[in-house]
Amino acid sequence: MPKYRSSTTTQGRNMAGARALWRATGMNSGDFNKIIVAVVNSFTQFVPGHVHLRNVGKLVSEEIYINGGVAKEFNTIAIDDGIAMGHSGMLYSLPSRDLIADSVEYVINAHCVDAMVCISNCDKITPGMLMAALRLNIPTVFVSGGPMESGSVTLSRYNNSSDVKLSLVDAITASANPNITDIDKEQIELEACPTCGSCSGMFTANSMNCLMEVLGLAQPGNGSLLATHFDRKEMFLNAGRYIMNLSRLYYEKDNSIVLPRNIANKMAFENAAMLDIAMGGSTNTVLHLLAAAQEGEISFTMKDIDRLSRKVPHLCKIAPNSDRYYMEDFHRAGGVMGILGELQRCGLLYENTYNILNKSLLDTLRQYDIKLCQDLEIKRMYAAAPAGVRTIKPFSQNNRWNSLDIDRFAGCIRSQEYAYSQDGGLAVLYGNLAPKGCLVKTAGVISELKSFRGPAKVYESQEESVQAILTGQVCSGDVVVIRYEGPKGGPGMQEMLYPTSFLRSMGLDLHCALITDGRFSGGTSGLSVGHISPEAASAGLIGLVCDGDMININISKRSIVLEVSDYVLKNRYEIEISRGTKAWTPSCRNRDVSFSLKAYAKLVTSADTGAVRDRSQL
């Protein structure tokens, strides 16, 4: 049988000092033979998705004690990508993912913890904790804070005829839209983010929390049940019960199937990618899945994403890919288990993956897929509805829909027969501009833009591109190229939500493309191609593009090509190399880069490997 990891600090004569310190935290002699569970919280008042988490750690801890364990809570950092967006603060977002993973590892290993419950929610916190879980490989349960309710407003330009549903992205685009009055802009700003929780569309945070369900490390409903709803309280209580059950299976019955690397294995990662493709999730999720797979020593690459994207249908469009459906609507339609049920009926899923419920995926679908479900309590959980009341309190309302959305013809989730497309909501493109691949969220691309050819407008920072867009320097038909914004070149791989949102504000989103070695917010739509690998700072071809060069993007052919001769490119390469130590750096960018970000840039790899540390340098 595996020994409790905690016995290193709780057993033996020479650990008297450690036990004395444990006692000073509230433990007693009877606790030294119990499983010690870390409750890894991420409460902060800086982030709406985490502002309500102050007391939920106590709920989990109390349930762990009731079930015979000892709970010890600590906190990680959390950055709000929306508040950090559009200025130098975004340089810190992606690096914070690795800091979170490291901080969890440090606390868990320093104190020899036996198991952990991860209370996450927003963009980099869930993947950072996932990386830590796979790195540490101790019994782990994830439970997220839940999505925000969508906003709602009646605007004068609609003649007061109907309410318009809103998300954060509407506030950003309205700020630069000359056709929206100041009064309407203010109303949108006031109502776009009405409650606590992760932003209300299928953005990065909600995409990741959905993927945790199919990876097997979180309960059904984790990604879609609203933060404000009373039912979410039971999820936190369940997390305490589940972690004690998993811990006993491992430490007392030597059942290693409950460990994260055995639950979230290669098949589970492929299932997660298929879910992401089917629901048109954020492209950031690919970055995080690739990084997490490396932590778990799982062979999962961009080639796998490419292969799966060609056979998985696109079954769901949620904001920002739709102005009709938001996370509360997705939950009403059965959430993650609803989509997985449709994929299972297509014969696409690996059905025998395992999860924290101590069930196979197939058995879980039989219980939780609302098309099959006979359990009235589960149906009641999926009927959890928004209240439309501004609040930052969790579990503060108990509204229910009168009926579930089981319409698979024109509802929030479609069947394969009525899919938006048969080849998925995400695609990997290859070509001379991206020999190691790049990503596009096809769920947000209209059919007319899926083949696009245009002249390049090149910018060496996000800020420069925003200024050009807002001052009319970008025209219909252009391909906006934003480079030196990759993991190394930024450094930090900023999200390009402001450039894409302002293209939309200026009426150019249906007439232009944008490509970058940076990344995109989950709120991005339009023909936005990111994660171009290798990045400019790693001598990628995107660093040699000049204004006016023709770029050809073809999603159906999965290609992205710079139409410049090899002879011309060779000359440009030699000119770039002649810059010496300044080669493959921006020629005219004014950006202060801190010591910590410079250290990050020294070790980080390009996006095709998840922007993880280059272990060959260690």
Swiss-Prot record:
Residues the entry annotates as binding Mg(2+): 81, 123-124, 495
Family matches, as Gene3D superfamilies: IlvD/EDD C-terminal domain-like
Keyword Iron-sulfur: yes
Active site: 521 (proton acceptor)
Broadest EC class assigned to this enzyme: lyase
Keyword Protease: no
Source organism, top-level taxon: Bacteria
Cofactor(s) of this protein: [2Fe-2S] cluster; Mg(2+)
Cofactor stoichiometry and binding remark: Binds 1 [2Fe-2S] cluster per subunit. This cluster acts as a Lewis acid cofactor.
GO cellular component labels: cytosol
Pathway: Amino-acid biosynthesis; L-isoleucine biosynthesis; L-isoleucine from 2-oxobutanoate: step 3/4; Amino-acid biosynthesis; L-valine biosynthesis; L-valine from pyruvate: step 3/4
Catalyzed reactions: (2R)-2,3-dihydroxy-3-methylbutanoate = 3-methyl-2-oxobutanoate + H2O; (2R,3R)-2,3-dihydroxy-3-methylpentanoate = (S)-3-methyl-2-oxopentanoate + H2O
TM ranges: none
Known partners and oligomeric status: Homodimer.
Family affiliation: Belongs to the IlvD/Edd family.
Function (record text): Functions in the biosynthesis of branched-chain amino acids. Catalyzes the dehydration of (2R,3R)-2,3-dihydroxy-3-methylpentanoate (2,3-dihydroxy-3-methylvalerate) into 2-oxo-3-methylpentanoate (2-oxo-3-methylvalerate) and of (2R)-2,3-dihydroxy-3-methylbutanoate (2,3-dihydroxyisovalerate) into 2-oxo-3-methylbutanoate (2-oxoisovalerate), the penultimate precursor to L-isoleucine and L-valine, respectively.
Entry protein name: Dihydroxy-acid dehydratase
Source organism of this protein record: Blochmanniella floridana
